[in-house]
Swiss-Prot record:
Residues 1-21, 618-648 are annotated as: Disordered. Residues 631-642 have a biased composition (Basic and acidic residues). The gene is pgp-3. This is Multidrug resistance protein pgp-3. Belongs to the ABC transporter superfamily. ABCB family. Multidrug resistance exporter (TC 3.A.1.201) subfamily. Keywords: ATP-binding, Cell membrane, Glycoprotein, Membrane, Nucleotide-binding, Repeat, Translocase, Transmembrane, Transmembrane helix, Transport.
Amino acid sequence: MKKTKVNPEDDITLGKFTPKPSPQDSYQGNFFDVFRDADYKDYILFSGGLILSAVNGALVPFNSLIFEGIANALMEGESQYQNGTINMPWFSSEIKMFCLRYFYLGVALFLCSYFANSCLYTLCERRLHCIRKKYLKSVLRQDAKWFDETTIGGLTQKMSSGIEKIKDGIGDKVGVLVGGVATFISGVSIGFYMCWQLTLVMMITVPLQLGSMYLSAKHLNRATKNEMSAYSNAGGMANEVIAGIRTVMAFNAQPFEINRYAHQLNEARRMGIRKAIILAICTAFPLMLMFTCMAVAFWYGATLAAAGAVSSGAVFAVFWAVLIGTRRLGEAAPHLGAITGARLAIHDIFKVIDHEPEIKCTSSEGKIPEKIQGKLTFDGIEFTYPTRPELKILKGVSFEVNPGETVALVGHSGCGKSTSIGLLMRFYNQCAGMIKLDGIPIQEYNIRWLRSTIGIVQQEPIIFVATVAENIRMGDVLITDQDIEEACKMANAHEFICKLSDRYDTVIGAGAVQLSGGQKQRVAIARAIVRKPQILLLDEATSALDTESERMVQTALDKASEGRTTLCIAHRLSTIRNASKILVFDQGLIAERGTHDELISKDDGIYASMVKAQEIERAKEDTTLDDEEDEKTHRSFHRDSVTSDEERELQQSLARDSTRLRQSMISTTTQVPEWEIENAREEMIEEGAMEASLFDIFKYASPEMRNIIISLVFTLIRGFTWPAFSIVYGQLFKILSAGGDDVSIKALLNSLWFILLAFTGGISTLISGSLLGKAGETMSGRLRMDVFRNIMQQDASYFDDSRHNVGSLTSRLATDAPNVQAAIDQRLAEVLTGIVSLFCGVGVAFYYGWNMAPIGLATALLLVVVQSSVAQYLKFRGQRDMDSAIEASRLVTESISNWKTVQALTKQEYMYDAFTAASKSPHRRAIVRGLWQSLSFALAGSFVMWNFAIAYMFGLWLISNNWSTPYTVFQVIEALNMASMSVMLAASYFPEYVRARISAGIMFTMIRQKSVIDNRGLTGDTPTIKGNINMRGVYFAYPNRRRQLVLDGFNMSANFGQTVALVGPSGCGKSTTIQLIERYYDALCGSVKIDDSDIRDLSVKHLRDNIALVGQEPTLFNLTIRENITYGLENITQDQVEKAATLANIHTFVMGLPDGYDTSVGASGGRLSGGQKQRVAIARAIVRDPKILLLDEATSALDTESEKIVQEALDKARLGRTCVVIAHRLSTIQNADKIIVCRNGKAIEEGTHQTLLARRGLYYRLVEKQSS
């Protein structure tokens, strides 16, 4: 035996474990933690990126120095031109010199911007690649206690959104912030250099500008958070309701839920309107402040120029230098939030990375014996879960398992059976006592070796997305193909694997070939067998299977257990009657122990009572039989599906996480609208919708048209602002060019125009933004409401469509409505302002110089073409970038979600290495993408300089040929410059308009969707219903599987007051029958009658008012207990509620709660146990006083103790009513007035329990299967 040190983290003195405090618990987060293990390349990239960003920022205000020179030359040229004495050689030389400087400055800005962003993007991707690997490695080595205190969704979210926040903080945002500070310092310095007096006046307004920007951001962030919180509440409520839509339909609660959703939306709408007004103020006030600042600065500057204290060009240059510096600093300041967010994300992620688990599952320390016998000893084991220290699970458990023995652990839920297995696997450490393997405490063994010598098969086996062979090889990577085949034969899996398309090379798991529960269980058994474990742990390995699958899996388990020490947990007592020893757990202690025969002989024993509770009374025999816990069948409305609703929801959740991770791994910016638009377009096509036009959207917004029209008028006024500014600005140029004694007076009068622009621009911005914001919010709320209302009115077939799953429908409400809102709210004002500014600016340019304007438009068009080409290339490679990250993102979500299986198989390093290999390609592609985006940013930043150079050179050519004047050239260039600024801002919203049209098309289609069945009950007869049910010759197939008949000539009748039970194998049509009675669907052929009325002639609302349904897994909503009991009803008194609760055996429990019937049950009833939820559901059914009661396996998901209480409540509830019962536990329906045996959609047997047993038909065989 190899011996090494005992794990230092465990103090095993006296069998008690004292974990050391984790130093990371006090970890506060450090921005520079991202540079842990960084090499010299990372530091070069970081320092280079910051230096170049600072240089780039500092160079931007140098534009003002060039502008001073060119403005002086133009004004002097204009003055000479007016006097007819222009010195063309001098003028031409000056203009060419400054144009050349513009060109050089553009080149410098391009190079600095490109290399700065390239350095920061590359650094960002290098560090994040390292952090992702560290994070996954750390997560996979944590212990169960740590996983209990966190959520899987939270862990994967940190890997996606958390990484995104770090990317924001250490990527281009840092460069923008550094550049903003550098621009401010440079701009102010240049201002003081050119004219300290004017700069001082300008500096007085700087605190006002920065302060207004800060306060705007602060209030806007607060308003946004409030709005998001309100919409989140509404979205959560909608998600819960749509998930429980069949319960909503069954209890006619659509009007209640529509009103509840409307109430939630009203609050969200109020917050949204408030945000819109704040946003309008935040946009209007800086505009007013800027124009006011211009008025003061230009008047004072003109006065200084007239006095000869400063050149005329410096008046313009100083203003723009200081303004550019201030604006850049203000625009950069919000990025401090990104850095703060990055620091918080670093804290969260590195807290995980640095966390040292109490149980180090990857430790190389501990004993590794060459051979073991397999004797297990539990000695005085005590245990409480760390998250529930007040509840002791094990209270001194002691037992032994000899080598080769099979010992079964039985008992009620929560008694400590699975906990014992978890302790043996060392997922947790016991609080007291000792667990020994061959006489040695398991803490002294190497934990990886310990787990590798144990094979475990659980109730819900985890199958990874890989081939069958690769899944089995997870048990032991060194096995041969022959070993795999032999293990599968032993596990009874070889036969079905050979029928798969690629046999052992068939890819299985989520998103690939789906296996049934029994098939997955047999693959898991084969995976356990190939480990050749000395110890085998079976944790309810057959409880989730139907009878046929269970028989095959049980046979495989019996083979696997031969010659191995086996611990078996079972609720189906028939599966463990041959065990060497049975240990009966009760309240954390072993209450009984012995063989099956020994324990069953104790009439008053716990084991004997459990068997009796499960046994089926049989004719001609009075033998006590062990009953199995019934199959937990697939509870969707299509029984032929392999995957359960819960699995599907989990797969969809993992798919969403995986998508976020893929985008996180390959995106270099936080927004990628091209992908969002493409995704939205694909969803639109799937929905069968067509892209809506803007006219369609405005037509829908007709109730808000008054506000829209008024706001559009003010938007037009706002659009005139910048073209008007260029004219007033040009007039100042003429005033300074002309000179004279009255310059100061003329400048003062000209400044009044700036004040007028401040007033008109600010007021029009405020009014247009507020009114359009209000209109957008109101329309968005109404759109959400209309879609939700129509969803509530659909029949069951609508929700069977895979396009209309819960996630898709809630996404429509949460995402598409805001997308459509973009076509109406403040973004419309921005777009229209840009368009108006463009046309007016171009109009001004052509008015003053028709021959000068085309060159400005041509250069702008050139930029658009270049930028569009880069954007198209990025879009082209976008999907390939996403595809490259599929495997890596899947490995992350799969390994974290299934951490316990990964650890049990000791495959942490395997999963880590697989992720490392899979993430190399997306890492390289992300860096390349960053270089292309750097090119785009660099072009945008340098274009203005090159545009000025080209425009002024062309203007010089026109002046030289007497086709234009210096003033005209200046006026046209400034008019086009102002227009281009506005249209560039508006252009950023164009992708949102494309998305708005797509989303509107989807939502309008959803609103127009007609239901086949009138769920509102506006039509149909409303006779008094007695409760007689008659089904004759009923044929039925689910709408999305028309070729597969579920009911094939089905016949059934139930007279008033009778209890009729439906039994039969899974998929025979039992639950379908109940759904037809509830009229979720209509039969294809045949008749379903209530009393003497065809169910299709009755009002659906009236029908359901007389029916109550209690299902296997009751749906409760996030309401109080009272509201859940009275769900869908009005005017129910407290006395009626309490009577119903008393009959349901829940009243005493409710009155023991602090808030009684006003206690909230939590989301999906999460604050109640399964039995408590079921009894609330029974009370909900009773309070309606229905004529017909439908019970669909109402006790099958409960443990024996809970089942007993609920069954008593059901027996009371069905008195005096027609009752249709579905049950797999045949013991629950043996006293029914009539039992109908179903198979293949037909009723093949009918009679009482005793009569059917006497026939020895299918019912008899079902009884035999459950008792064997």
